[in-house]
Amino acid sequence: MKGFRLVRIGLAFFCLCGFLLSGCGSGIPMRETIGSAGTESDLAQTTAMTDTETEVRTDQPIRAKGAAYLYGETEQDAISYRVGELIRFHIRLTDTADFRLTYPCAKLVWHAEADDGQNWNGTDSGDSGRLTLAFSMKAPGSIRVTVEACDRDGEKLGEVQPFVGGAICGFEQIRTGTECPKDFDVFWQTQLGELDDVPPEVLYIDPADSPNPNFRAYSVGIRSHDAEAPVTGYLTIPKNAKAGSLKIRMFFYGYNASFSPSPQCADGCMTFAVNAHSMENGREKGYYADLQNGALKHYGFEAEDYRDPSGSYFRNMILRDVQALRFLKAMKEWNGKEILLFGGSMGGFQATAVAALEPGVTELSVFIVWMCDVSGRSIGRLAGWLPDYTENLNCFDSVFFAARVTCPTVITQAGLIDYTATPTGMAAYYNALRGKKQITFVQSADHGLSPIRRVTYSESQEGGKR
């Protein structure tokens, strides 16, 4: 079934989660004017508005009722563009207190860069408070555009939040920068073989404070492949749950070592909040701070971690995650049918790996998944916070795990300016999934943060790899 796309516009708030077009191929952005008599100062006299909003112009200096910011969006669905098609960004200077207002400024200074290696810079008049920029890309991938309000000397106006936005072209064609290693499955079957010899025995299960009076909570330790690094986390079970009555629900956290997971409760589920690092649960803050600043500082980023991937930090983390699920599958309360995995950022990486490696997962829900397209930078794509690329890092690419996931998957958020979980990486992840799937991209959303005004673009497919 052909995927659909949906655009929604609405107010949003900052929230933590865990964690262009060249002028017809010339490499020069097109300058667009309105009407046959338009001049360069007439740039972008139109922009997308909600049904009830009407443009209100003011010629006074910026005296915002709320906070002044540059708002922007693409003329079309931001993930629908084809390679070579013009991607138009409409930007205007407005106000958090009244979106109808448009403010002038002296100059609008902008920069754009794309996965295909193109870069653009420019300065335009801000007299109208509006700007349209149009670019084209030469290959599938993403583009990032930054626009700043400046004074007549080109200095940034500190009271105005810049616009940073993005778009994707050739969405359906996007794949990882390199192919999946031919021995990917052999590697992981070998690692899982180490777990097969270690039953998930309970080392301790101590009562813990429950956030819900209808649930029992436990701090749990489970034997795993490394006797010195057991599985740890919090388990919650509804009171008076009968044998065979509950779904399994697992929750994985983002990149951090400064805190312990907390008990999570969901009706009809036994929920395990996984501690990624085999740390003790519920210790004092100093215990976690010492680990964050010591043994676990920069974990997973050490080059020696990938000289032999069978000894890497993330390999051991994933094996503990799989062992945690094996423990839950052995519990009498499980209904034997439903397994739900949740996680964002590094938690999304873990959840995807478990869904790929352990049979029986029935639903995967993730957001801003980390470790997607780890080789992207090596072919010139825009990339951000990832370990330095080596071929062995491919053993941990979330996209290659996604290609082995067959259950329904919902990607609740991907940011169009997120260069920790890059837009291109998230597109490759979505394209690799083999089951029913849906993804929602958020314009101007960075890693774990939503913009002042939220615009989303969604794609879904009933099933089958693209």
Regions found by a protein language model. Give the residues of each.
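N-terminal targeting or regulatory segments adjacent to alpha/beta-hydrolase or S9 domains
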Residues: D51-F215
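Cap/lid segment of the alpha/beta-hydrolase catalytic domain
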Residues: S258-L319, G376-R377
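C-terminal motif of bacterial Sec signal peptides marking the signal peptidase cleavage site
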Residues: S22-G23
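The feature captures the conserved acid-bearing segment of alpha/beta-hydrolase catalytic domains
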Residues: G380-A432
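N-terminal cap/lid segment of alpha/beta-hydrolase-fold proteins
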Residues: P200-A241
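C-terminal catalytic histidine-bearing segment of alpha/beta-hydrolase fold enzymes
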Residues: A427-R466
